[in-house]
Regions:
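Charged catalytic cores and adjacent phosphate/nucleic-acid-binding surfaces used
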Residues: 2-91, 99-157, 225-259, 263-388
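Low-complexity, highly charged intrinsically disordered N-terminal segments
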Residues: 212, 216-231
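Non-catalytic, alpha-helical, charged scaffold/linker segments
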Residues: 117-118, 132-214
Length: 388
C-alpha cells in the first residue's frame, strides 16, 4: 500500500499516513542516500555541464570571481565556459568554493566564512590569488580547514534540530511560520532520523564536500519517486524555515574574525572582495582593507545603482589612495544545481551561470557604470594587475 495517496485525477490533494512510512531506511532510501553523496558524475550529468541549454555569443568579456564548482571537475568547467561564451576576448574566472581553496590555471580562490566582531554577525569574504606559494600558505590553509569543519558541523545541528526533543521549540516555530501540519512535521522527523543514521553508519564513505546543509534538501528531493510531490514540496518549505532558525542560533565564536582572515590573505598577496552587499551592510561600514565590493548578486539586486555611486564617490574623494575600490558583480553560481534533472532543480538557482551577470547590460545600471568609466574589461585588467 502506498504511503502517499493521490486523490483525484489531477492529484490536487496529498495525504500521508505516518503509520505506513517505514521507521528504518529502506533499500530505496539507502540508494537515494548514496546517490546524493556521490561525487562521480554520470554521462547524463557530464552532458548537462558541457552542453548548456543557452549560450551567450555576444558577451565579449567574462568576469567570474564568485562561483562554486562543487563536485564538477575543472576540465568540465572549462568546456562549459567555452560553450557559453564562444566569442570571448578575455576572461578572469576564479573559483571560490566555500572554505576550500581551489585552483584554475594560475589563479586560486575561496569564499571564507568569518565574522565581524564589531557587529557580531557572520560575514563572507572572497579571496583571490595568482601563483600562490602553497608552502607559505600553511596558516591560511589551516584556518580554512578549521572553518570548513566547523561550518560542516552545522549540518548535524540542523539534523538534531529536526529529530531531538530538546529542539522542539525550533520545530514549532518553523511549523508556525510555514503553516505546516503535524503529519508533515512527523514525516520530516522520520526521514531526517534516517538521514542522520545513514550519515553516521557510513561516515568513512561520505565525502567531506557532501557534509553541508543542502544534503538534507537533496535527500528529500531524491524521495520524490516514492512520495507525492506535494508532500515533498511541503516538507521542503518547512525544512527551509527550520534551517534558517538553525543558522540564526549557530555560534559565531569559532569563526575567525574578518580582520584576521584579511591580514593573513594579504600577507600572501591576495585580492579581497566583499560579496553579498545587501546581506552584509555592516561590513561595508567597517572600512576593511579590500579591493572591491560586489554591487550585484542574484540574491542582492535592490541597491545596485546606489552602491555603484557610493563606491565611485568614495574613490573620487581619495579615500582609498592609489588602489580605488573596484566594482564587481557576482553570479554566485553553484554548479551542482546543473547536475540535477531539470524537474528537480531550484529554478532561482538553476538560472545562474558562471560569468553571467545581467546587470552589466541593464540600461539603468549601465548608465551609472558608463558615467564612472567602469566595464568588465577594465575591471579584469585592473584586478589581474593587482593579483600579479
Amino acid at each position: 500500500m502506498e504511503a502517499v495517496k493521490k486523490i483525484g485525477a489531477a492529484a490536487r490533494c496529498a495525504d500521508i499516513d505516518l503509520r505506513e512510512v517505514p521507521g528504518e531506511a529502506t533499500e530505496e532510501e539507502r540508494a537515494a542516500f548514496f546517490q546524493v553523496i556521490s561525487t562521480q558524475l554520470s554521462p547524463e550529468q557530464i552532458i548537462r555541464i558541457t552542453q548548456p541549454q543557452q549560450t551567450y555569443p555576444r558577451q565579449d568579456y567574462v568576469l567570474a570571481v564568485h562561483w562554486h564548482p562543487e563536485q564538477v571537475p575543472m576540465e568540465l568547467v572549462d568546456q562549459r565556459l567555452d560553450a557559453l561564451y564562444p566569442h570571448s576576448q578575455g576572461e578572469l574566472v576564479i573559483p571560490t568554493q566555500h572554505n576550500v581553496l581551489l585552483h584554475r590555471g594560475d589563479y586560486s580562490g575561496v569564499e571564507v566564512d568569518c565574522y565581524s566582531r564589531g557587529f557580531n554577525r557572520k560575514v563572507q569574504l572572497l579571496l583571490h590569488f595568482k601563483d600562490i606559494k602553497m608552502e607559505r600558505a600553511e596558516v591560511l590553509l589551516c584556518m580554512l580547514k578549521h572553518t570548513f569543519k566547523y561550518r560542516s558541523s552545522q549540518l548535524f545541528e540542523y539534523l538534531n534540530t529536526l529529530v531531538e526533543p530538546a529542539f522542539e521549540d525550533r520545530l514549532q516555530l518553523a511549523a508556525a511560520q510555514t503553516n505546516t501540519d503535524e503529519d508533515i512535521v512527523g514525516f520530516v522527523r522520520v526521514q531526517a532520523q534516517k538521514l542522520k543514521d545513514l550519515l553516521l553508519e557510513n561516515e568513512e564513505q561520505v565525502p567531506d564536500d557532501a557534509i553541508k546543509n543542502k544534503l538534507v534538501r537533496n535527500f528529500f528531493d531524491a524521495l520524490r519517486q516514492r512520495y507525492h510531490d506535494r508532500v515533498i514540496d511541503k516538507a521542503q518549505v518547512f525544512l527551509k524555515a527550520a534551517k534558517e532558525i538553525v543558522k540564526r542560533h549557530f555560534s559565531l565564536d569559532y569563526f575567525y574574525r574578518a580582520s584576521e582572515v584579511i591580514e593573513e590573505a594579504r600577507s600572501l598577496g591576495a585580492g579581497v572582495v566583499i560579496p553579498h552587499p545587501e546581506q552584509f551592510w555592516p561590513i561595508l561600514l567597517a572600512d576593511y582593507d579590500v579591493d572591491g565590493i560586489e554591487v550585484w548578486n542574484p540574491q542582492s539586486q535592490q541597491y545596485t545603482e546606489f552602491l555603484i555611486n557610493v563606491v565611485n564617490r568614495r574613490n573620487r574623494m581619495g579615500w582609498h589612495g592609489k588602489r580605488p575600490i573596484l566594482i564587481f558583480m557576482g553570479d554566485d553560481c553553484h554548479l551542482s544545481e546543473k547536475l540535477k534533472a531539470p524537474s528537480e532543480q531550484d529554478p532561482a538557482k538553476a538560472i545562474r551561470e558562471v560569468g553571467l551577470q545581467p546587470a552589466w547590460d541593464d540600461y539603468a545600471i549601465r548608465k551609472s557604470l558608463i558615467i564612472n568609466g567602469v566595464n568588465r574589461k577594465k575591471v579584469i585588467e585592473e584586478y589581474r594587475s593587482r593579483l600579479s
